[in-house]
Amino acid sequence: MPVIRFYDGSQQVYEHSVSLIEIIKNKKPSIMKSLIAISVNNHFSNLNTFIREDAFIEFVDQKNYKALNIIRYSCAQLLSYAIKNIWPLAQIATSNIIEDGFYCDIDFKRSISEKDLILLENQMKTLVKREYNILNKLISYSEAREIFQKCFEKYKVSLIDENINCNSKVSLYYHENYADIDIGLQVFNIKFCKYFKLQKIGGVYWKKNKNNKMLQRIYGTAWTNKQELDKHLDYLNELEKRDHRKIGKFLQLYHMQEESPGMIFWHNKGWIIFNELQNFVRVKLKEYKYEEVKTPLLIDKLIWKQSGHWDNYKNAIFTTLSEHREYCIKPMNCPGHVQIFNSRLKSYRDLPIRMAEFGSCHRNEPSGSLHGLMRVRNFTQDDAHIFCTREQVRSEINDCIKMIYDLYSTFHFKKILVKLSTRPEKRIGTDSLWNESEKDLSDMLIENHLSFEYQSGEGAFYGPKIEFILQDSLDRNWQCGTIQLDFYLPLRLSSFYINEKNEKKVPVIIHRAILGSIERFIGILIEECSGNLPTWLSPVQVVIISITDISSGYVKELFKKFSDVNIRIECDLRNEKIGFKIREHTLRRIPYILICGEKESSSKKISVRNRQGHNFGMIDVDFFIKKLQKEIITRNFYQMEE
């Protein structure tokens, strides 16, 4: 007498073994048309399966929150099936789901092109039209191995050998005659996989090991209905329009090249943005009483061993040799700041010491992960390290929080999310020290009226951490700011101060970052603003365009007037139609376009319009300059409207 329990908490008793079809007809016959999968005791089951013992059953229809991943798992292996149909000699390595989609890694003799994606997508659509049932089978280790050996699928054989015990069963899914290793619950019938799109091709090392073969990864997205798919594709189109790499190239801000992967060649206009942002942070550093320092790019490997960074991050650290001595190209600033702290004896009266640096850091990121300004190998950290006593921690944390929010408020992000990462299993320090430290951070967040989410066990082994995540207008989250307590590094690098009892005491270090990486933050801003940066950050703030040659003298006069008050200005005296000039400079995202013709020259005024197309009409030059200066000095995020 099997007792069947359902996801909604109800249960039903049967006097004999019963098929899943019969259970559905008794429980919820209306679900049959939209039923994509059934889970029995958290495992996929076929409709014809008979239940002979007590079981927990969940019906998954298209409205169920689990449906999306089930469809994506199915699409991932549908793609694998399509690949084998078109290119029988291609070897499937792995397939899986990711956020918003799925992927398949393949080993193939030639590079896959955009045209190939269309070919594969059409093949997938053809297979979906067959409306075949997807079958799940449990077979022995040796049977599974034999199936993939016969197909010359060496990657599948490798996965079975490494991940499955030889005495265990192997779960396979069958798309018609194509067999693949179970990666996740799939739909009953392929007809539920209509709404997908293949998107792009990338490269990835087998098992993420750069010593292994480079595979080709095909990415796709899949949804439960056409509306959701179209909505997602529209979102991706918007992302593409805002892509900082395209905008950066069009506006001539920077470029990158193969001879220096992950390194940025800043052009003049991009470097203006960089310096303006850096100078803004400098103003805040002065306001919050930080001292700015500069530490060497090369530091002996011995320091990095002492700090513990070599043991934990050596694969990401670039090194170089000179006179039989090995140096590390610094991946972070903290050990260098500790050297400055250690360079002379400190008293408790000297603390807190707030040390900031715009440090040029290098990290050996995998080439496949590099992405414009967002993921680079050389970046500028705006971090700081506060050396303080245990008693000063709370007030310093409080000031860090205020500084972070003060700076972020300038950029008007949609939302700031806050997360508090607490002690991991492997850690240093006593439980009482961790209790105090975590309470210090949480109390300061509460005192500042900030709601936050706990990330249990996600802190570093040397201390808890607060993360500040910026949410942009497209609902993407960017983790930028951090406040991290560290009891470990000063101990490792023998830092101490003399307390009021004339005893040596180890200081606490607070690691603090606001922008994180200046390069990455510029990329975030470009995408958030679609390249329409606020006037104070814009490389060119004003362009003056002439209507006729007659007004060129007045244009030059205006150019000098604006330049003399440090407004970044350009002239356009070309013999082109005025509409063409306006359109071109609007596309260049220049905040204000000044138009000068005979009327403006004779009245000594200017006609002003902004890049949104708002026309201010003809106004007094000095009045406009004052308004513009105010907008720049106050770092207003929005342009003047009147």
Swiss-Prot record:
Pfam families: HGTP_anticodon (PF03129), tRNA-synt_2b (PF00587), tRNA_SAD (PF07973). SMART domains: tRNA_SAD. Its EC number is 6.1.1.3. Residues 243-534 are annotated as: Catalytic. Binds 1 zinc ion per subunit. Its cofactor is Zn(2+). GO terms for cellular component: cytosol. It catalyses: tRNA(Thr) + L-threonine + ATP = L-threonyl-tRNA(Thr) + AMP + diphosphate + H(+). Zn(2+) binds at C334, H385, H511. It is found in: Cytoplasm. Residues 1-61 form the TGS domain. GO terms for biological process: threonyl-tRNA aminoacylation. Disulfide bonds: none annotated. The keyword Iron-sulfur does not apply. Catalyzes the attachment of threonine to tRNA(Thr) in a two-step reaction: L-threonine is first activated by ATP to form Thr-AMP and then transferred to the acceptor end of tRNA(Thr). Also edits incorrectly charged L-seryl-tRNA(Thr). Homodimer. HAMAP family: Thr_tRNA_synth. Belongs to the class-II aminoacyl-tRNA synthetase family. This is Threonine--tRNA ligase.
